[in-house]
From Swiss-Prot:
Family classification: Belongs to the HAK/KUP transporter (TC 2.A.72) family.
Disulfide linkage: none
Membrane topology of this protein: Multi-pass membrane protein
Transmembrane spans: 19-39, 62-82, 113-133, 150-170, 177-197, 225-245, 259-279, 291-311, 349-369, 379-399, 406-426, 431-451
GO biological-process terms attached to the record: potassium ion transport
Annotated organism of origin: Pseudomonas aeruginosa (strain ATCC 15692 / DSM 22644 / CIP 104116 / JCM 14847 / LMG 12228 / 1C / PRS 101 / PAO1)
Entries under PANTHER family matching the protein: LOW AFFINITY POTASSIUM TRANSPORT SYSTEM PROTEIN KUP, OSMOTIC STRESS POTASSIUM TRANSPORTER
Keyword Hydrolase applies: no
UniProt name for this protein: Probable potassium transport system protein Kup
Catalytically driven reaction(s): K(+)(in) + H(+)(in) = K(+)(out) + H(+)(out)
Record carries keyword Transport: yes
Gene transcribed to yield this protein: kup
Stored Pfam families: K_trans, K_trans_C
Protein's cellular compartments: Cell inner membrane
Protein keywords: Cell inner membrane, Cell membrane, Ion transport, Membrane, Potassium, Potassium transport, Symport, Transmembrane, Transmembrane helix, Transport
């Protein structure tokens, strides 16, 4: 986990106030999505066209399905097991993919599968990042329709105002108001629990739903729609992936404690309270969440619901920023400008391109679907797809990293896979009912990410063709030494055994070399952070030539000047006014050579042209950089 989270969790072992503070923070960041699911889950089950009757058996059967889904998928799978699969404390589909890829290193095909699975999981997460704000805020604002007649036409405009405002403030950061997220969400879960108790007291028989017999009986008595209902009940699990993705901020224990001590009891009570309301009045199925509340509490609950959904949306947006930074470092996404919005919290970042793309997607979803009930069909595919990818990657971790015995690992993995596959299969019919959006968004994002990754590989391969071996070049410099000028020249190169093109071009045109020539390679590791003692490798070739390899984790910012200043070697001088950085700027030309389809080559050329260059990405000083261009056919 991050250094701050590690220190905080260690401190929490001896100080209850620190432990409570971490739990409250985890509630505000990790549980917003799953915490707002009661707004729309039961409503979708009973009015979503599945044919479930709002009678005694139907209500108890659905409640039992939701209860045991929360217990198995969230409590057992995610909280108890998946949270243990941390990549040096970091979680999320990208971190898990990097961990599984490292574990699968001896198996080429398995490693390829892990990479593809990780890309699909990340692509689905971006689709989920668009749907969550739209359905959550719409669900909250729809409470006004219960409080006041004739406000149906105002639901979409009000939701758009809230959502657009949320995206507009992202550039300025949420550090100041972020401190309120935890307390507000604690209040939200307290309200969920209180409303649930209020409903359960009126119909205590709903507590029978904790008996799994009701879920089994529901399936047996509804053979035609039993599996389809899973496509709706899975809405109660939305946000389970966020627990894992945000682990680096708080650590495993605070997230787990918050779940078992507050979030799970509040969710179960509220779902059971809604079920009690439906048992008392079948008409309440049209919006059981708001109809559970007493009349005097309706408007306060609309206001609190809106706050909770905004916080949930903020957490998802921040998660998209964080995932993008990881993907950039791991080489799956073109480099983008990353702006820090807080001087105290390293994780508070803003990526403009991602923010505006999400905003456009969210606005189109709200305008296209117009209600949370319509959006619910699109939601399940992204959620269950991501859960299935996590299970597949966990299988690799259990086998290769944890080395569980087969008698334990195989049955556990098979049960996880069967449950997630059942949920995913139940949601596949939704693709033709509105669920195509996350699938299309996922396909587009997967194509972009895989094209960028493959294009970068082809680019390096083409640059390597005809490259001059470093040993040959240094030997030739000794035979015919060029004129040397004062200072240090740093040439960035992806290869550690070949001469950079920028060095050859500089020597060809300027006929000079610096006193010190550093061939620099930056390696992005599969781990989130690299310890200072592993940051750099230095090798001296003699005659003023040096090879330096810098290592960065996928959660770190590659600041080359700062890292080079840590290279403690007497012969090297990296003082700012004596160091010049030479970069190559490649222009890709699509060709008929074997590599990628022509349209993908054109797409890669476009992405490369619009990506941030090495200058910004590596934090190089503007007045000490020389860029040399070259054209490359791929």
């Amino acid at each position: 986990m991050s250094d701050a989270a590690t220190r905080a969790e260690e401190t929490s072992e001896g100080h209850s106030s620190s432990a409570i503070g971490l739990m409250v923070g985890a509630v505000g960041v990790c549980y917003g999505d799953i915490g707002t699911s009661p707004l729309y889950t039961l409503k979708e089950v009973f009015i979503g066209g599945y044919g479930v009757q709002a009678n005694h058996d139907g209500v108890l059967g659905v409640l039992s399905l939701i209860f045991w889904s929360l217990v198995w998928v969230v409590s057992i799978k995610y909280v108890i097991f998946v949270l243990r699969a941390d990549n040096q404390g970091e979680g999320g589909v990208m971190a898990l993919s990097a961990l599984a890829r490292r574990a699968a290193a001896p198996f080429g095909r398995l490693q390829t599968f892990v990479v593809v699975a990780g890309l699909i999981g990340a692509a689905l997460f971006y689709g989920d990042s668009m749907i969550t704000p739209a359905i959550s805020v719409l669900s909250a604002v729809e409470g006004l329709e219960i409080a006041f007649d004739g406000l149906e036409h105002w639901t979409v405009p009000l939701a758009l105002i809230v959502l657009i405002g949320l995206f507009l403030i992202q550039k300025h950061g949420t550090a100041r108001i972020g401190i309120l997220f935890g307390p507000v969400m604690v209040l939200w879960f307290g309200a969920l629990a209180a409303l649930g108790v209020y409903g359960v007291i009126q119909q205590p028989e709903v507590l029978q739903a904790m008996n799994p017999v009701w879920a089994v009986r529901f399936f047996s008595s509804h053979p035609g729609i039993g599996v389809a209902i899973l496509g709706a009940t899975v809405l109660a699990l939305t946000g389970a992936e966020a627990l894992y993705a945000d682990m680096g901020h708080f650590g495993r224990k605070p997230i787990a404690r918050a779940w078992f001590l507050l979030v799970l009891p509040a969710l179960v009570l509220n779902y059971f309270g809604q079920g009690a309301t439906i048992l008392s009045n079948a008409e309440a199925a049209r919006n059981p969440f708001y109809l559970l509340a007493p009349g005097w509490a309706l408007l306060p609950m609309v206001a609190l619901s809106t706050l909770a959904t905004v916080i949930a949306s903020q957490a998802v947006i921040s998660g998209a920023f964080s995932l993008t930074r990881q993907a950039i470092q791991l080489g799956y996404v073109p480099r983008m400008t990353i702006q820090h919005t807080s001087s105290h919290e390293q994780g508070q970042i803003y990526i403009g391109g991602v923010n505006w793309a999400l905003m456009v997607g969210v606005v189109l979803l709200v305008l296209g679907f117009e209600s949370s009930a319509s959006l619910a069909a699109a939601y399940g595919v992204a959620v269950t797809g991501t859960m299935l990818i996590t299970t597949l990657l966990m299988g690799v971790v259990i086998w290769r990293l944890w080395k569980w015995p087969l008698w334990l690992g195989v049955p556990f993995f098979c049960v996880m896979l069967a449950v997630d596959s059942l949920f995913f299969a139940a949601n596949l019919p939704k693709v033709i009912q509105g669920g195509a959006f996350p699938v299309i968004a996922g396909i587009v994002i997967f194509i972009l990410m895989s094209t960028w990754k493959r294009g970068r590989q082809l680019l390096v391969e083409r640059l390597d063709e005809g490259s001059l071996p470093l040993s040959v070049f240094i030997s030739s410099m000794r035979v015919q030494p060029p004129h040397r000028v004062q200072g240090t020249a740093v040439f960035l190169t992806a290869r550690t055994d070949a001469v950079p093109h920028a060095l050859l071009h500089n020597l060809l045109h300027n006929q000079v070399l610096h006193e010190q020539v550093v061939l620099l390679t930056v390696v992005n590791e599969d781990s989130p952070r690299v310890s200072p003692d592993r940051r750099f490798e230095v090798e001296a070739y003699g005659d003023g030539f040096f090879r330096v390899i810098l290592h960065f984790g996928f959660m770190e910012e590659p600041d080359i000047p700062a890292a080079l200043r840590l290279c403690h070697l007497n012969e090297l001088d990296f003082s700012p006014m004596r160091t010049t950085y030479f970069l190559s700027r490649e222009t890709v030309i699509p060709s008929k050579r074997i590599g990628m389809a022509r349209w993908r080559e054109g797409l890669f050329a476009f992405l490369l042209k619009n990506a941030n260059g090495n200058l910004r990405y590596f934090n190089l000083p503007l007045n000490r950089v020389i860029e040399l261009g070259t054209q490359v056919e791929i």
